[in-house]
Amino acid sequence: MAIQIPRGTQDILPGDVETWQWIEQKAYDLCRRYNYQEIRVPMFEHTELFLRGVGDTTDIVQKEMYTFEDRGGRSLTLRPEGTASVTRAYVSNKLYGQANQPTKLFYIGPMFRYERPQSGRMRQFVQFGVEALGSADPAIDAEVLALVMRFYEELGLKNLKLVINSLGDTDSRLAHREALVNHFKPRIHEFCNDCQDRLEKNPLRILDCKKDRDHELMGTAPSIHDYLSTESKAYFEKVQSYLTALNIPFVVDATLVRGLDYYNHTAFEVMVDGEGFGAITTLCGGGRYNGLVEEIGGPETPGIGFALSIERAIMALEAQQAKPAHNQAIDCYVVTLGEAAKDKGVELVYQLRNAGISAEKDYLDRKMKGQLKAADRLHAKWTVILGEDELAVGKVNVKNMETGEQTDVALTDLVSHMKQQVEGGNES
């Protein structure tokens, strides 16, 4: 019996990898323009990092983490998200002491959560995220929002909606927390077990419950906006004014609550509207997390960031029929006829590749017709035909596969000739 792929994972095959590389390159190029530098962190961390950084009352920590003990008895966890690891690296490597501040970082890599696999949710998934650490300026909130919206726009996605909210500062959240407890407590027995546990630990998370979202108390729950301090209101208004100045449309939703404990002030999601995308509409989430760095042992440091799923971006592209067509073409295919020509073909392909030209040859002893079909399947721009007769006179036949035009070229000149064709785009 063949061994099957683990549930909740996927093989990304060569034809699909090109789309992934295209999306990832968009992220790299955009982050370079915004002056964000790539950081690469371990795929597993000490479990304590996520207990403190993500929050021990969150679904991620309570239900979804892949946690194990190593042979030394240490509790380790495959990273379920990127922000905690990046902030840990920020503290461990004392990036807060560098001259260039704020520290602006981005990452692309796999995350792991034990979830029920469904459309848009995998147990191993790839996130692109950015983190800006060291600035409490509303302008950098706007920058992060501008970056993620531009990312989706450059992918070609339409019908995007940016939803924002303010979760306030510490005083605002404490006042709102008390109001939520008073609101839900008399009838908390009508809610799910998770919500009952959250009442005292983190009542804000009740508003994020999927099971009880239609309960009548949800619609009448106290709004955080009624408890925002003067400073929090001013901060949120400034973020909105920047977005307006940048011509970035947004919607304020006072019920927006992110599923992680570390968020405060600005919280946001990017959603996509339109048919064909199923029940999954949220593409990206993020927000400000002042206090997270201190929670994991660093100095007082404000921060803001987002994370998005590459898989969901691809789903959205497919739903909108905006997924780009990729036909990876090679520059030339070397066709050989006869043993001596075959041996020489090995040398020619090696020389062409070393000169920066993508080249391929036959390894299945196919006849000329089969080799030409292989060249066509690989979208070869040129074929280089070498038989016993050509070898005897020291020449090859170079054929432009688009125009059909053929030219005889000396073997000793082949590499320079092909470089001229490839780099100059000339037809041969």
From Swiss-Prot:
Keywords noted in UniProt: Aminoacyl-tRNA synthetase, ATP-binding, Cytoplasm, Ligase, Nucleotide-binding, Protein biosynthesis
Which PROSITE patterns does the entry link to? AA_TRNA_LIGASE_II
Enzyme class name: ligase
Q: GO molecular function, one example?
A: catalytic activity, acting on a protein
User: What EC number(s) does this enzyme carry?
Assistant: 6.1.1.21
Gene Ontology biological process terms, A to Z: histidyl-tRNA aminoacylation
From the Swiss-Prot or TrEMBL record, state where the protein is found: Cytoplasm
What does the record give as the reaction this protein catalyses?
A: tRNA(His) + L-histidine + ATP = L-histidyl-tRNA(His) + AMP + diphosphate + H(+)
Concerning Pfam families, the annotation shows: HGTP_anticodon, tRNA-synt_His
Superkingdom of source: Bacteria
Quick one: where is this thing mainly located? cytoplasm
Q: Name one GO cellular component term.
A: cytoplasm
| Family as reported in the entry's similarity comment | Belongs to the class-II aminoacyl-tRNA synthetase family.
Quaternary structure note: Homodimer.
Q: What is this protein called?
A: Histidine--tRNA ligase
Q: What lineage, starting at the top, does this entry show?
A: Bacteria, Bacillati, Bacillota, Bacilli, Bacillales
